[in-house]
């Protein structure tokens, strides 16, 4: 059921950090209510890329995505960038009205840059604001290091796992850093 207070969480895995050269290889979304309770998990999509694109990844991405199994999932996938965008939009339209939710996640500006370049319809679905958990992480590191250090991430670099960790991290900062 659509609710303008719901939040859209997204994470992308890419072949690198440059949206003009690199591409999205995995995406996932979660919708939460405003209290960070998960309402629905969207499709987790490995996006097919040709072998020459995968061969162009740097050492870190080659190792990380190879070890996680993502590179193989991308090779085996038949889902195009356009199909992934359409599937994700169809999911989000059930839960959140267009342009009502900020884009939510960790270092979310990077994801937004890739969406703007490769999935402009999806990028346009979000409100122009960002809810970036990394802002609180940076503030906690400076103002309350014990709070920052008390949250440990798994760092699987798989899209759905990363979103779940971002939501848990924001809950952690809400409970231990932000005085409500």
From Swiss-Prot:
Superkingdom of source: Bacteria
Keyword S-adenosyl-L-methionine: no
Primary site of residence: cytoplasm
Residues at the catalytic site: 128
Keywords: Cytoplasm, Exonuclease, Hydrolase, Nuclease
Family: Belongs to the oligoribonuclease family.
Role this protein plays: 3'-to-5' exoribonuclease specific for small oligoribonucleotides.
Name this protein carries in UniProt: Oligoribonuclease
């Amino acid at each position: 059921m659509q609710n303008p207070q719901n939040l859209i969480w997204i994470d992308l895995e890419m072949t690198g950090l440059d949206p003009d050269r690199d591409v999205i290889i995995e995406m996932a979304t979660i919708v939460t209510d405003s209290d960070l309770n998960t309402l629905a998990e969207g499709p987790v999509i490995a996006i097919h890329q040709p072998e020459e694109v995968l061969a162009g990844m740097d050492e870190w991405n080659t190792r990380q995505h190879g070890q996680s199994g993502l590179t193989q999932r991308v090779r085996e996938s038949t889902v195009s960038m356009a199909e992934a965008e359409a599937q994700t939009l169809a999911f989000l339209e059930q839960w959140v009205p267009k342009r009502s939710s900020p884009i939510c996640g960790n270092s979310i500006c990077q994801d937004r840059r890739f969406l703007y370049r490769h999935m402009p319809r999806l990028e346009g679905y979000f409100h122009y604001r960002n809810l970036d958990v990394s802002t609180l992480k940076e503030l906690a590191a400076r103002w309350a290091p014990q709070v920052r250090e008390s949250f440990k991430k798994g760092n699987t670099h798989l899209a759905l796992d990363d979103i779940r960790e971002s939501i848990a991290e924001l809950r952690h900062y809400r409970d231990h850093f932000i005085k409500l």
